[in-house]
Amino acid sequence: MARYTGPATRKSRRLRVDLVGGDMAFERRPYPPGQAGRARIKESEYLLQLQEKQKARFIYGVMEKQFRRYYAEANRRAGKTGENLVVLLESRLDNVVYRAGLANTRRQARQLVSHGHFTVNGKAIDVPSFRVSQYDIINVREKSQKMNWFEEAQDNLADAVVPAWLQVVPENLRILVHQLPERAQIDIPLQEQLIVEFYSK
């Protein structure tokens, strides 16, 4: 399945969650699109589970096949499968760039990573799904630091709200991964247990 690149607001309305962050159009109409959008429709257990899976996929910009691999790995790990899944998704490099305040959306962060603007521990990485580890050091590449976008982002980093598991060094455009996130530190409106139930059928 190809990555969804259509109108983000429409997808947000269908899944009833702001997939972009700060989507004013969604806030004005937070119900599904179409004539029956406001109608109360009895949702089956399967539909609720499917919607939650789709919500996770679109929040993190992950294709179906890749999402299945994330779930399989989460299921193999010790602990709660649902929480493992969310932590794996949250540990993607594009998400870390977004969380650190170097991009306004995950979609934008994915583009910045794909265009080769970052290094991890001194090595150039252009794979958005690259999984960060504890104590990783992420830098904006020196030749990219002069770009208007990063210069503007640098000015705003001092006021950015960054998760406790990350630290941003504004003057160096550097991100430090102090630890991998715990589920309680991830502010995603997701009922991951429904995803576990979906794949357990």
From Swiss-Prot:
Disulfide bonds: none annotated. Belongs to the universal ribosomal protein uS4 family. One of the primary rRNA binding proteins, it binds directly to 16S rRNA where it nucleates assembly of the body of the 30S subunit. It comes from Corynebacterium glutamicum (strain ATCC 13032 / DSM 20300 / JCM 1318 / BCRC 11384 / CCUG 27702 / LMG 3730 / NBRC 12168 / NCIMB 10025 / NRRL B-2784 / 534). GO terms for molecular function: rRNA binding; structural constituent of ribosome. The lineage of its organism: Bacteria, Bacillati, Actinomycetota, Actinomycetes, Mycobacteriales. GO terms for cellular component: small ribosomal subunit. Pfam families: Ribosomal_S4, S4. Residues 91-151 form the S4 RNA-binding domain. SMART domains: Ribosomal_S4 (SM01390), S4 (SM00363). This is Small ribosomal subunit protein uS4. InterPro entries: Ribosomal_uS4, Ribosomal_uS4_bac-type, Ribosomal_uS4_CS, Ribosomal_uS4_N, S4_RNA-bd, S4_RNA-bd_sf. The keyword Nucleus does not apply. The keyword Ribosomal protein applies. Keywords: Ribonucleoprotein, Ribosomal protein, RNA-binding, rRNA-binding. PROSITE patterns: RIBOSOMAL_S4, S4. One of its GO terms (biological process) is ribosomal small subunit biogenesis. SUPFAM superfamilies: Alpha-L RNA-binding motif. The gene is rpsD. Part of the 30S ribosomal subunit. Contacts protein S5. The interaction surface between S4 and S5 is involved in control of translational fidelity.
